[in-house]
Amino acid sequence: MSLDDLDQTMRDYADAVRSGAAAGQGWPEWINIPSKIGQVAAVRIYARDQREQAMRDGQLIVAVCPGLVDTRASRPWFTDMSQAQSPGQAAIDVVKLDTGPIDTQMYGELVQHGRIIPWTEPAAIPN
């Protein structure tokens, strides 16, 4: 899959939402889920395509999930924000990824609090 293929998939999803056909096509009701999947897939595809150059240059490309963050945008969607991080707290893990030693096992993965979150069972993204 290429970034163009993913872009078309996400455009098709957006069209299905607008037309009211998304549920009938098997998409989840909550639009946050497909949008986050699209974001992570884009990073994984980009990381796959850039791996050789990134490794030579000492770059780490990962998708980061900070977890629940207490922001004005998230409050309307969650009734219990007691476990949410502040934006500053959420930024700590991102800064550590940026400034710390590179863990090549994290390359192209979804990372939360310094740990890889399995996307699915280990699977290669097809070209």
Regions found by a protein language model. Give the residues of each.
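Catalytic loop of short-chain dehydrogenase/reductase
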Residues: M1-R56, C65
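Short helix-terminating capping/connector loops at secondary-structure junctions
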Residues: A54-G58, D103-Q105
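A short C-terminal helix-loop "cap" of Rossmann-like NAD(P)-dependent dehydrogenase/epimerase domains
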Residues: A16-A23, L68-R72, G88-I92
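A general structural-boundary detector
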Residues: G26-E29, I61, P76-F78
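Short beta-loop-alpha junction of Rossmann-like oxidoreductase domains
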Residues: Q53-A54, L68-F78
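C-terminal helical subdomain
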Residues: A63, T71, F78-N127
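Low-complexity, compositionally biased segments
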Residues: Q8-M10, A73, K96
